Amino acid sequence: FHRSTQTLQSLGYVVSTGKVVTFRSKELITNEHTKNTVPLIWMNNFKNKQLVHPLDFGKEQYISTDNPSLLIDKSNYIIIKRFSSKEQKKRINIGYIFKDKIEYTQIGLENHLNYLYRKDDEMSKKELMILGDFLDSELTDKYFRISNGNTQVNATELMNLPIPDDIYKELISARKHKTENTRYERTTEKIQYTRALSN
């Protein structure tokens, strides 16, 4: 870790905090699913790191779209719990949100969650899993316990988390692969479009 020169921030990743503070949004959150609501995600909605929604655990599962500033666009995200207890096995607890599993254009994230995403582009699933495995590793857990004496996992500390060289190389490879796939898809679409015009 100490020889690492790259961080999540330097690699273009962003960690933000869920925008839905429930006691300030009581009139917006509900358990009723209507055409004017979208999923409200809590850490309890993750089982074995996978999103399960809706789920009955005593918390409202939907939020109204009346206040768009509280919502985020659907994308590939790593969710990180902001607070952990000293009794928990790991300091960092994560979950995954996959864009293709979300039926809505937007979602709400409860304020006790951080979410990790790319600043300039959407993370690929491979990128997501590489970073997720790294954050969930024993190595990262030990680093956080040594460098952070409290049980809060804040966005700034995550942004400054050193990225080991092997993880950095994996991420660069995943990005390159995604870029090549995107170029191929765009070229294929262009060819198909040109053929359609010529027919």
Predicted regions and their residues:
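Polybasic, glycine- and aromatic-enriched phosphate-binding surface used to engage nucleic acids
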Residues: 2-197
